Amino acid sequence: MDEILAIHNLTKKFDDLVVLDGINMSIKKGEVVVIVGPSGCGKSTFLRCLNGLENIQDGEVLLDGDVINPSKVKNNKSREKLGMVFQSYDLFPHKTILQNVTLAPVKVKKRKKDEVTQEALALLERVGLSAKKDNYPRQLSGGQKQRVAIVRALIMHPEVLLLDEITAALDPEMVREVLDVVLSLAREGRTMVIVTHEMQFARAVADRMIFLDGGKIVEEGTPQEFFDNPKTDRLKKFLQTFTYES
């Protein structure tokens, strides 16, 4: 697989607090990288830095060899190749589901509305929501809203999809319906960087696991290596928090 996303010495600070401390990472086309770690370790901030939602103090982010740091490049078309799905859905409450999905490709990419509508309907059908196309977000469950958010990202044809704790705000019964969609995307060979606390899902979907703590990559490996044979005491301790023994 060819490299699609490269991160070199990425450093992010909030005032004097170092949130990301010299992160280096290479992601290949079709690879699914899952990032886990304790709360406050910098996982979500890392995704926001990749997508240009946060400025960085040092380092660079390259997509297909092009620098996409927001502090160095303005209005870079390469940044449109990164799609992001947030924990909070971020749907427009005053627009229907279909309008939420079709707005960006028509307004931003200047695509024909009829063409976009047909693609949107096909994507909504794929995630089991075509019957909800004329509904408003307030009429949907949390799991349904998150599936709409995934469709809204996919219709922009991103080369890399960033998923930030997309099940964290969902009731347990709704988690599976969202994770099944993501798992199907992984099996298609889509490139994804996923932040999650769902360890069973991470093991099933990941090509590579990364453990982030204190703004640094502490350990990485295949899911089998990561879960069955962790090398560092810190990762062992972290994984133990997900097991319960009387």
Q: Predicted regions span which residues?
A:
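C-terminal boundary and immediately downstream tail of ABC-type ATPase nucleotide-binding domains
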Residues: 220, 224-246
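ABC family nucleotide-binding domain
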Residues: 2-223
